[in-house]
Design a protein with these regions (language model features):
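Histidine-dependent nucleotide/RNA phosphoesterase domain, centered on the 2H-phosphoesterase fold
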Residues: 1-182
Length: 182
């Protein structure tokens, strides 16, 4: 039986997230069930137990101060993969730092590609589908009038089970930080 894979994401539950989910429903209906998210740790098998990984993540996330990122333009990862995404433009370094800090212990693995902070719109089977979807996504994103910002204050540890991703545990950021209101 193959091992479960795990990932770490932050859900985008604001108008940007709604935009991405609506666009995905239109362009790739078979994946319409996926929630809009920024991937912090791409899918991987654990080197230890789920409980140990969760303990590490809880402690590490408690020391991270919540932050905002600003989104940039719509791009693709072609020719590497037929994925259409929105770039993280401002504060991408914060996402990369978080990725690097949390890639240790039970979550350590060799990733297939260099880590690039992004908000996935869709991943297709064929390059041509991704190119066509990218054209539509760029047009729609240019018309989006809301704030292109994501507040990162909670991560979600997720597990792949039978091809579906399930939430394992929420990980609030900054629990170990002193309040700035003291």
């Amino acid at each position: 039986m193959p091992s479960s894979r795990y990932a770490l994401v932050t859900y985008v539950r604001n108008p940007v997230g709604e935009f991405v989910e609506e666009l995905r429903r239109e362009l790739h209906p078979t994946k319409a069930h996926l929630a809009a998210h920024l991937t912090i740790l791409p899918p991987r098998e654990l080197t230890g137990t789920e409980a140990a990984a969760l303990e590490f993540l809880e402690e590490a996330c408690s020391r991270v101060v919540p932050f905002d990122v600003e989104l940039g333009e719509v791009e693709t990862f072609l020719p590497t993969t037929p994925t259409v995404f929105i770039q993280v433009k401002r504060a991408a370094y914060r996402i990369r730092e978080l990725h690097d800090q949390l890639s240790g212990k039970e979550l350590c693995c060799e990733e297939n590609w260099p880590y690039i902070p992004h908000l996935t719109i869709l991943k297709t089977e064929l390059d041509e589908q991704a190119r066509a979807a990218c054209v539509v996504a760029r047009e729609r994103w240019a018309q989006f009038s809301g704030k292109r910002q994501v507040h990162v204050d909670e991560l979600m540890f997720v597990r792949e089970n039978g091809g579906c991703w399930q939430d394992v545990a929420p990980l609030p950021l900054g629990r170990g930080q002193l309040s700035s209101k003291l």
